[in-house]
Amino acid sequence: MARKTPIKHYRNIGISAHIDAGKTTTTERILLYTGVNHKIGEVHDGAATMDWMEQEKERGITITSAATTAFWSGMAKQFEPHRINIIDTPGHVDFTIEVERSMRVLDGAVMVYCAVGGVQPQSETVWRQANKYHVPRIAFVNKMDRMGANFLRVVEQIKTRLAANPVPIQLAIGSEEKFTGVIDLVKMKAIHWNEKDQGLTFEYQDVPDDMQQLAEKWRQNMIESAAEASEELMDKYLGGEELTEEEIKQGLRQRALKNEIILVTCGSAFKNKGVQAMLDAVIEYLPAPIDVEAIKGVLDDKGTPVIRHSKDEEPFSALAFKIATDPFVGNLTFFRVYSGVVNSGDTVLNSVKGQKERIGRIVQMHANKREEIKEVRAGDIAAAIGLKDATTGDTLCDLAHPVILERMEFPEPVISVALEPKTKADQEKMGIALGRLAKEDPSFRVWTDEESSQTIIAGMGELHLDILVDRMKREFNVEANVGKPQVAYRETIRKTVEQEGKFIRQSGGRGQYGHVWLRIEPLEPGGKGYEFLNEIVGGVIPKEYIPAVDKGVQEQLKNGVLAAYPVVDVRVAVFDGSYHDVDSSEIAFKVAGAMAFKEGFMKAKPVLLEPIMKIEVETPEEYMGDVIGDLNRRRGVIDGMDDTSTGKTIRAQVPLSEMFGYATDLRSQTQGRASYSMEFLQYSEAPANVSKTIIESRNTK
């Protein structure tokens, strides 16, 4: 079967924003204008097509990145049909894992900002993730019809807060209730959309007289940015020649693809203005799969690097980036094809797990409606039904040409709670439900506490765990009692010590003999976490016993010493010891290693580390004193304050243990007018009084 859309007409994009910037409405409008969706879904009444999980409808926030396919030929039908695959990304900080995951499979992104709120803390996190994966992006300043909307202020914030180089290619005509359209700076024309048909048609008009000067200024700024793309354009520009419309677009595209500039558009999705022109910008300035670097992978045996180009002729390779459970068809594995072609019914290799998988049915999703297709090709995003072993981040590839595309890195959870099923019947169902949820979301962990036999779940924040418990109830009908949230503390040391460990047993028959000297030293935080060195010379301990010493130390690391929390940031070297020809064994050296580590650890100035969160609170000015006072009471350190159009943003670092129930407290302090966002920043040493309380409560259990 031949390719319907040439790969150069593909755009794999993400739409990314913080909560309430209007991302879901923007996506809805895209689906409307691309002709897929005929009735506009409004988030206000919970009917948005992209928000297809039930709690998203209730909370009005987007949780799962659903992938949707749409076609666009331009506002004035000026392009050949382009296929736009949209990955919807969540804006809430507890779901950064989803954002990270979708950034991995995108070629470009549209960053949606609120014209009133501007660049929010969450936008900065998403921006950093987009930088990490070198994703070219354009900005869409939404909500131009709202009170306090200011387009150029947001442009300035993109520059100062994100350290980016914004280049507006449009200006807003009016703002708030007087917002009527946009000026296209490339054509130097005003665009007005027809309100009667929800913006499906439009007309060009002359630039309003009172905006002529401003438009000229920003047009020059844009042309200068375009001219910097090449010497040829620069010479023409400096020689006083006018750049043609084509040359301006070509220059802007080249620089946007290299991430040197970020093109800024504006509008109001709710009022059906601007999304249409932003879609044109997606086609003109964001990359096709062939415009981005070929993906690098490794061949398993020797780690030899391999490259896969976005071509149908190359061997098949794809990355599974999301697992979702569909009530009707079971497991859906969303994957992005980087090279080659795969047909339904083909058998492929899951190279990370080393297992073969049969691709049953392939579907393309339109939010949560499914369209079954027979094949997918390089550049496509689709979902396979019924893959058994694939988890997020796995590579699927041609059996004859194995490759592992880079693994995604997932953060460690910072908060855990105990779960108790309400009835005996729930017990078994809970195990199945948690297994499914953990497969979908790698930042969510499940284990059984050995002492209490309780099931423990851990994740990236309170909201993250709330939603997972909620999903268990809705999707799997499992009712559970949830314990108090527990903070994931860590243990480490502050000085270097040397410690002997001796394990000798003589009780008739063969004895046990293991004897080691360990040097235990602190490592830089945030590095490897644990390093083991073998410094034995002259065979005082035979080589075959060294891994057993390492194993003994590692078991102790896992169980902790001070208060049974995992130990991090230590280097352990075994440098001396002795053995017995008959009595020495692996188990004896394992025990000796564990004993030496445990004793040495307590002499090496052990400390407890606690997770510190980065908090940003937006509050009206009159509550600022209360908010700061409250953060100080929570052992917070205030980093700084910014003015916003509606008050102040306070930036602080606060221990996670002090943040439980903060949402409720903040609401009551500010009569519901303040909002906050929180993300994990780092581990740092807990004060002595806090450590003492935690250690005592852990050791009395």
UniProtKB/Swiss-Prot annotation:
Localization per Swiss-Prot or TrEMBL: Cytoplasm
GO molecular-function terms, A-Z: GTP binding; GTPase activity; guanosine tetraphosphate binding; translation elongation factor activity
Cellular component, GO annotation: cytoplasm
Residues annotated as binding GTP: 17-24, 88-92, 142-145
Keyword Transferase: no
One of the GO BP terms on file: ribosome disassembly
Keywords tagged on the record: Cytoplasm, Elongation factor, GTP-binding, Nucleotide-binding, Protein biosynthesis
UniProt cross-references to InterPro entries, sorted A to Z: EFG_II (IPR041095), EFG_III (IPR009022), EFG_III/V (IPR035647), EFG_IV (IPR047872), EFG_V (IPR035649), EFG_V-like (IPR000640), EFTu-like_2 (IPR004161), G_TR_CS (IPR031157)
Domain tr-type G: residue ranges: 8-290
Keyword Nucleotide-binding attributed: yes
Family according to the record: Belongs to the TRAFAC class translation factor GTPase superfamily. Classic translation factor GTPase family. EF-G/EF-2 subfamily.
Role of this protein: Catalyzes the GTP-dependent ribosomal translocation step during translation elongation. During this step, the ribosome changes from the pre-translocational (PRE) to the post-translocational (POST) state as the newly formed A-site-bound peptidyl-tRNA and P-site-bound deacylated tRNA move to the P and E sites, respectively. Catalyzes the coordinated movement of the two tRNA molecules, the mRNA and conformational changes in the ribosome.
Protein known as: Elongation factor G
Origin species: Hamiltonella defensa subsp. Acyrthosiphon pisum (strain 5AT)
Underlying gene: fusA
